[in-house]
Amino acid sequence: MTTITPIMVKELRERTGAAVMACKKALQETNGDMEAAIDLLRKAGDAKAAKRAGKTAAEGVIVIAISKDQKKGFMAEVNSETDFVARDTNFMAFASKVAERGLAEGVSDVAATLALPIEPNSSSTIEDERKALVNRIGENIQIRRVASLSSDGVVGHYSHGGRIGVLLALDVPNPELAKGLAMHVAAFNPQAVSANQVSTEFVEKEKEIFLARAQETGKPANIIEKMVKGQVEKLLKEVSLEGQSFVKDPEKLVGDLLKAEKAKVLAFLRFEVGEGVEKESQNFADEVMAQVQGNR
């Protein structure tokens, strides 16, 4: 049996916000499996911040490049070790060049991006420039991820201070709508366009947690089944773009807005700097919400 150490208990407490004894008990019951312990605490209703699971520190910037006809977009997360370097002009110039070249060459993975010439017909690559920047600045610089999106309609985008970036493909040429929806995605962080696109794995995991909590009520099985079904349906609306209230007009669902505009969201991509990292200093999604509401 795995020995449960104070360090393990401390880590679980930091990642969930649960009480010390609850963390220790969860680790004992899961034989030291940190992820299983987090799920156990969630089922018991003890975890306050399960989203902290599996986090690693990262600073940097999200950069976006859009084609002139607004039908193609490219987005990248370029990381540094500190926020100070993330604001450095040389770092920002490199990140912008990554987006520019990624869009021009139509790449969609990090390896292909690093192999691109830093300028057309140049013998020097983006990877060469990255290494040179590391030597100049003295910090590890990495291109963490990249993505591209295209549409015959329009690709909208939104950037919140370089911390959150969104690309959104709309099937009709309505740039204003696409930008508004991209801003919405930045603020609300939906998991999918529609409820039926939410991953089965996510739904089953949440359903298991709802069931565990419902069973604690001691109600009959048929009542518990209805309770869980209702909770799952509510959750699917909350995490799908079409089921959410539009950030610029909370009285209207995004799905209803799209119907009125005779438009369809084909896909969206959302990057946040250090995604998976719980920052104590600021919640940037909440900041987007505050900014949008203030501009109404």
UniProtKB/Swiss-Prot annotation:
It is found in: Cytoplasm. One of its GO terms (biological process) is translational elongation. GO terms for cellular component: cytoplasm. Gene3D superfamilies: 1.10.286.20, DNA helicase RuvA subunit, C-terminal domain, Elongation factor Ts, dimerisation domain. The keyword Oxidoreductase does not apply. One of its GO terms (molecular function) is translation elongation factor activity. Its main location: cytoplasm. The keyword Cytoplasm applies. Residues 82-85 are annotated as: Involved in Mg(2+) ion dislocation from EF-Tu. Keywords: Cytoplasm, Elongation factor, Protein biosynthesis. HAMAP family: EF_Ts. Belongs to the EF-Ts family. NCBIfam families: tsf. Associates with the EF-Tu.GDP complex and induces the exchange of GDP to GTP. It remains bound to the aminoacyl-tRNA.EF-Tu.GTP complex up to the GTP hydrolysis stage on the ribosome. This is Elongation factor Ts. It comes from Coxiella burnetii (strain RSA 493 / Nine Mile phase I). The gene is tsf.
